[in-house]
């Protein structure tokens, strides 16, 4: 009988070796399941992707009210129909190529995001090679979720304004350079100063809000596209609104509408419970356009809630670009829920008002419930030597104007510069994407 050698040391793998082996096993396991499922799918059996599992069936009459973009429902079927009527934009594959940046992410990095999604393979199996271009991005799977949720927010804003113009609205978001709100144009305007976002890099709320503003500003304010007039876009970075500025917009422009975007962070690792009721209030407002945000590593479009569960559309299902446009692919019967305690603190909130009376009504509702997120001021404070607070949101007129973090007043910046202090503190917002990727931050003072 062999005796154990007391001098022989057990073989212990390093942490890095163990992690590497685990990653390999995970990938191999996923690939095995993928091939098995693909084989079953090509033989006629398909499953709904896990990320798109629908909400569970409920009784027709529910005990708790469902709130969706300012509408209240006590009947599940009615709520379900309303949710399904909203526009849903998700990952797309096979769109007009977006050239990669020399020093940016490589398209091949996102190969797993496409190959491990059965729906993409089923719908485009014959043209599989066209999805994998080493020099160009032909899909945003794996990196474009914040862009897609921002498109969701903007598209449903336009749908509130023009409920009978759904086909015309969807045309504005087609994945090509000629469509005003395409992913191509989001990338184009975000590549400018101060963001410098490259194709394949993840957006955060700041980048998303500035991109929407720039794209809207490129269109003449009095110009209509297929009967659709694009609203004015304002960014309130630290959630301050000034009454006199809103009044000026409506006084100067007849039939104006204003989309106010709040790119905010409401906590460190998770949303502080202090803000829960305020988030629910903004979603319940009849002026709500929803929230683009999510949980860590993913961005979702939140459009309502039931009790403490937020209702959202998930953009992480890749669909193949179709010509002519398949309108059914811009609606989904599979929406999900997320408890507010799991919500990532970094988000972009949208509010739409179409006249000064609506703004006053929105303001009154916020003051009545003591909303902790939005703050109102009667007048814009002039920039003076004794000023400690600067205007907290500004309007971009063209590409040359910069996106300024107005949490720091100009006077404070000047004082810091006189004292030799740096004013280039990084933006506190984190990107909602794969956290292993590089984070695009916006400088506070540019």
Curated annotation (Swiss-Prot):
Compartmental location: Cytoplasm; Nucleus; Preautophagosomal structure
GO molecular function: cysteine-type endopeptidase activity; protein-phosphatidylethanolamide deconjugating activity
Catalysed conversion reaction: [protein]-C-terminal L-amino acid-glycyl-phosphatidylethanolamide + H2O = [protein]-C-terminal L-amino acid-glycine + a 1,2-diacyl-sn-glycero-3-phosphoethanolamine
EC class name: hydrolase
Disulfide bridge map: none
One GO term of the biological process aspect: autophagosome assembly
Name of this protein: Cysteine protease ATG4
Phylogenetic lineage: Eukaryota, Fungi, Dikarya, Ascomycota, Saccharomycotina
The encoding gene: ATG4
UniProt keyword annotations, A-Z: Autophagy, Cytoplasm, Hydrolase, Nucleus, Protease, Protein transport, Thiol protease, Transport
Pfam families given in the database record: Peptidase_C54
Biased composition annotated in UniProt, kind: Polar residues: 1-19, 412-424
Catalytic center residues: 145, 314, 316
Family: Belongs to the peptidase C54 family.
Biased amino acid composition, Low complexity: 436-446
Organism: Candida albicans (strain SC5314 / ATCC MYA-2876) (Yeast)
